[in-house]
Amino acid sequence: ASALTRSHVADFLVESGVCVNRKKVFKRYLNKGGKAHVPAEWCSMSTAIGAIKGAGGIAILAHPGRYPLNRAKLKRLVDTFRQVGGEALEASYPNIAPEMKQYLEKLGVEFSMYLSCGSDFHDAAATWTDVGKLPALSSEVAAQVVWQHPVWKARVDAI
């Protein structure tokens, strides 16, 4: 099963000739202030984590360095995420500043969390990211990489 997303709507509007490209669709219609913008309804952090873990997944805080938070607030977010059952932190992704990557790795160590990395790929039409193009995690955190998590290892062993 698949879900209809804003990207599908953008593609439809481009294909229909309403806009010349996706960027214009998002700016004019889908982003905040746009004619067709619908605010997201978010569940609580603990509800999301429960759903992820209930489905057999690993709850990972995605690209936390991109949130508009100072370091004290970011640390509080990571602490709260961990307290409500989050297990991992994405510490590397495209265009991350080296200092932020190092800080996220430090937070992962401090809070005894697994660390992940990802190219933040959303769909093939996205031009702002390339699959797999991101800085590697530091060798100092090799024992904490998410693929060392028991859930991950069990899935790999089952293949």
Predicted regions mapped to residue ranges:
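A mid-sequence, solvent-exposed acidic-amphipathic segment
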Residues: K35-G56
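Surface-exposed cleft-lining segments at the edges of enzyme active sites
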Residues: K27-P39, A91
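Short acidic/polar alpha-helix capping motifs at helix-coil junctions
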Residues: A10-S16, A40-S44, R66-A72
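Extended, charge-rich helix/loop segments that form flexible
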Residues: A1-R28
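Short, mixed-charge, low-aromatic patches
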Residues: S2-S7, A36-V38, I58-H63, Q102
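Non-catalytic alpha-helical scaffold/packing segments enriched in small hydrophobic residues
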Residues: H8, F12, S44-A51, R76-L77
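Charged catalytic cores and adjacent phosphate/nucleic-acid-binding surfaces used
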Residues: V20, I49-L61, G65-I159
